[in-house]
């Protein structure tokens, strides 16, 4: 049984203006609401929907920065939560030509001591789940080393 998934999605740091937020609402069954606390909340049917929505927002940021001749800078996470987002970004790269050539990425953590090629390394996780599938330049990838 699928349960609705909700989470706070912020436009802070995405570079999306009001016009962009209107144009990129994502799947039609997404419900968007601003509570009394003014925290923008999005409720979707399942994790695949939220992964697509987040990936669409990241893609819009990348495309907008590319159009302005700027570099898109992404802070990325590891673990099971972002895997669906990374899969959708890979699909957008392969099927729709989303380019990561002008993207710089940062991850915040790594185990210590941990060699980058260790099966538990966040460095390895990012290369296996995103970087090796898109055209990001290796020199633009910043994952702390634990060795």
Region roles according to the model:
Residues 2-4, 9, 20-73:
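N-terminal glycine-/serine-/threonine-rich phosphate-binding loop
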Residues 31-38, 98-147:
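Ligand-binding beta-strand-loop-alpha-helix segment within the catalytic cores
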Residues 43-44, 74, 111-116:
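A short glycine/serine-rich beta->alpha loop
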Residues 55-63, 90, 94, 127-131:
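Generic structural signal for well-ordered alpha-helical scaffold segments
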Residues 63-95:
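Glycine-rich N-terminal segment of FAD-binding domains in flavoprotein oxidoreductases
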